[in-house]
């Protein structure tokens, strides 16, 4: 797996030397296993193809549910697990219908691959700082496939809405679960364009 990661980094670096346009985005992700946010950097190789880097943070929350305690008249969370995922994906976007429709509406297909780190915090410790001192983590290979639409704003910034699927499987199960992938909804806001 280390050779594959090194190969991806070399390909990314050599292909990005002649890039014409660079874009940075902030992403908000709503997945069936939780929620997250991310940072995205893309460089256009052609007018309809870009490559880049996609850094994400997921807080896994799918097995939790509220329980009402009538004695204290409060809700508590049952099944709480402190699992964090940190994907580092190398991505490519292919923009459909380049030059055929108005520039303010740009559909695209995206594919990403790379390592991700899964971190399991100790749920028995209530202190946030102490909880993350004694963690178990593992690194695995993940991938993502999706599609979306960029909407250009008159100010020059771009908003994007997309749907996709993450493949995030771990080698050693965490809380008897080995697949943290699934569908996601992506909201993207462009923060910089060079």
Put a short name on every predicted segment:
Residues 9, 18, 29, 43, ...:
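Generic marker of residues within folded, mature protein domains
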Residues 17-59, 190-194:
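Short glycine/proline- and aromatic-enriched beta-strand/turn motifs that initiate or cap beta-hairpins
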